[in-house]
């Protein structure tokens, strides 16, 4: 089975289903043994984001750890799709006055598969993963330390972004 990229998520097309919008999962909990449960957002087969809970070692830099886990991609058994292009590295992350400034390597742009829906999932996965933390209300995405207008030519990311709950759906493969 090949790896699934952000662009592949949307080839099947998505459909707007009334009543399927769920509240964002805001659950950062102690998992015991010095671990923490965080929520990561990945693409699903319908072209929306779906939450995947992941247990990580408790760390003071939990937002940094969450971004590194997001870059790793979803677990194989989740049936979800990676939203961050392969080869992308987290350069830096800072949180100040409710704003998370997250800086990625050039690969997030240069290796992005493109498409407005794929770009939306990439941005949404970053923003929604970071805004689960109570200290983060907005997210500014940088590439190699610079503010950029867009990742793949469709969506403006030159200004801080807020949580995007409208693109979160439960995993269609679960009941």
Pin down the residues of each PLM region.
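Bimodal "functional hotspot" detector
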Residues: 1-175
């Amino acid at each position: 089975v090949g790896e699934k990229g952000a662009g592949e998520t949307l080839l099947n097309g998505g459909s707007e289903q009334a009543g399927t919008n769920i509240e964002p999962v805001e659950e950062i909990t102690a998992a015991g043994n010095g671990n923490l449960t965080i929520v990561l957002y990945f693409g699903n087969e319908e072209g929306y984001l779906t939450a995947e809970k992941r247990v990580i070692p408790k760390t003071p830099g939990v937002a940094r750890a969450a971004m590194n886990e997001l870059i790793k991609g979803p677990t194989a058994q989740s049936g979800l799709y990676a939203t961050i292009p392969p080869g992308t590295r987290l350069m830096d992350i800072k949180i100040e006055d409710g704003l998370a400034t997250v800086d990625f390597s050039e690969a997030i742009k240069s290796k992005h598969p493109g498409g407005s829906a794929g770009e939306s999932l990439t941005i949404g996965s970053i923003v929604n993963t970071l805004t689960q933390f109570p200290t983060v209300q907005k997210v500014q995405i940088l590439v190699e330390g610079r503010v950029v207008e867009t990742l793949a030519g469709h969506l403006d990311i030159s200004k801080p972004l807020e949580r995007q709950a409208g693109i979160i759906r439960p995993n269609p493969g679960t009941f």
